[in-house]
């Protein structure tokens, strides 16, 4: 059994390709379809904090429309606590387009 977890979006080609690469390399990850089972607020904060530590900016795509809304740039680093309220209270429907992997 692998200790890899993939937060997967089956509609996303990148996520499907990543899952295929994991399988092709003999890994059997735990698969969480985050669109069907979204993490709670606390789970998401812990997950992002565990993966990115103080570099939350690394988990937001440079092209993401949230970058200007949060006054972020790819050079800056942001503490998760400083933006999580905005992300969780964001009014428009944001459709996640990629899965991500947690190893460990």
UniProtKB/Swiss-Prot annotation:
Reactions listed under catalytic activity: [glutaredoxin]-dithiol + arsenate + glutathione + H(+) = glutathionyl-S-S-[glutaredoxin] + arsenite + H2O
Swiss-Prot/TrEMBL keywords: Arsenical resistance, Oxidoreductase
Gene3D superfamilies from the UniProt entry: Glutaredoxin
Example GO BP: response to arsenic-containing substance
GO terms assigned for molecular function: arsenate reductase (glutaredoxin) activity
EC number(s) stated in the UniProt entry for this protein: 1.20.4.1
Positions annotated as active site in the UniProt record: 12
Top enzyme class: oxidoreductase
SUPFAM superfamilies in alphabetical order: Thioredoxin-like
PANTHER family: ARSENATE REDUCTASE, ARSENATE REDUCTASE-RELATED
Family, as annotated: Belongs to the ArsC family.
Function of the molecule: Reduction of arsenate [As(V)] to arsenite [As(III)]. This protein expands the substrate specificity of ArsAB pump which can extrude arsenite and antimonite to allow for arsenate pumping and resistance.
Note: Is missing about 40 C-terminal residues compared to paralogs.
Protein name: Putative arsenate reductase
Organism of origin: Escherichia coli (strain K12)
Name of the gene this protein is made from: yfjU
């Amino acid at each position: 059994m692998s200790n890899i977890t993939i937060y997967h979006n089956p509609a996303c080609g990148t996520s499907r390709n990543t899952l295929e690469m994991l399988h092709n390399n003999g890994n059997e990850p735990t698969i969480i379809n985050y669109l069907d089972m979204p993490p709670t607020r606390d789970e998401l904060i812990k997950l992002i904090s565990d993966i990115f530590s103080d570099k939350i900016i690394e988990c937001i795509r440079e092209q993401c429309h949230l970058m200007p809304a949060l006054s972020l740039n790819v050079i800056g680093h942001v503490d998760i606590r400083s933006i999580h309220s905005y992300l969780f209270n964001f009014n428009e429907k944001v459709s996640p387009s990629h899965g991500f992997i947690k190893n460990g």
